[in-house]
Amino acid sequence: MQSNVIKIIIGASLLIGVGALYLLLSLKTPDKPLAGQVNIYEDNAEIGGDFELIDQNGELFNSDELKGKLSLIYFGFTSCPDICPTSLNKITKAVEILSENKIDIVPVFITIDPSRDTPAVLKEYLKHFHPKFIGLTGDEKQIREVADKFKVYYAKAASENDNDQDYMLDHSSFTYLMDKNGKYLKHFYLDSAPSKIMEFLKSN
């Protein structure tokens, strides 16, 4: 009897330990693929594509408008408490570094929360980052289609809150570098230094 109790205690301790380790790794690497995310690490992964959304001024925006320019594309949402603003600050710094080196690049923020992130909300939010930022929204179907093209994972986080408008989103956190033809070049993680983009462009 006593040995069975000990086995149960040991088993429970192992489960708790594994759960704690998983949580720690998830918090330390929020930009790695989450459950359900398509693997973008494969060399032959097709990332990106044409799209049409609405910008922060309420105007129709076609991805063709990015042709002829390098661009940095990030998917997030304005209610994101830490990962998104951290990423947008890094993109802002990267744009500044590239500008100092005479490299023109367009930063683009695409919301994954279109029901709350209206053009007006995006416009106000992006005032905190580089003035060149283009903010894009659309309906749920449009956003999902664009996110799928970029292999972006996102989903509503589980919550016990009954308020339909008070929710968080789990999402991957990559910054995509696209060439002047709108083709994917490379993606950068949350922990990548802004200077990494410059280093990549200089070596390629």
Swiss-Prot record:
<protein>
    <recommendedName>
        <fullName>SCO2-like protein RBE_0699</fullName>
    </recommendedName>
</protein>
<keyword id="KW-0186">Copper</keyword>
<comment type="similarity">
    <text>Belongs to the SCO1/2 family.</text>
</comment>
<feature type="binding site">
    <location>
        <position position="80"/>
    </location>
    <ligand>
        <name>Cu cation</name>
    </ligand>
</feature>
<dbReference type="Pfam" id="PF02630">
    <property type="entry name" value="SCO1-SenC"/>
</dbReference>
<keyword id="KW-0479">Metal-binding</keyword>
<dbReference type="GO" id="GO:0046872">
    <property type="term" value="F:metal ion binding"/>
</dbReference>
<feature type="binding site">
    <location>
        <position position="171"/>
    </location>
    <ligand>
        <name>Cu cation</name>
    </ligand>
</feature>
<feature type="binding site">
    <location>
        <position position="84"/>
    </location>
    <ligand>
        <name>Cu cation</name>
    </ligand>
</feature>
<dbReference type="InterPro" id="IPR036249">
    <property type="entry name" value="Thioredoxin-like_sf"/>
</dbReference>
<dbReference type="InterPro" id="IPR003782">
    <property type="entry name" value="SCO1/SenC"/>
</dbReference>
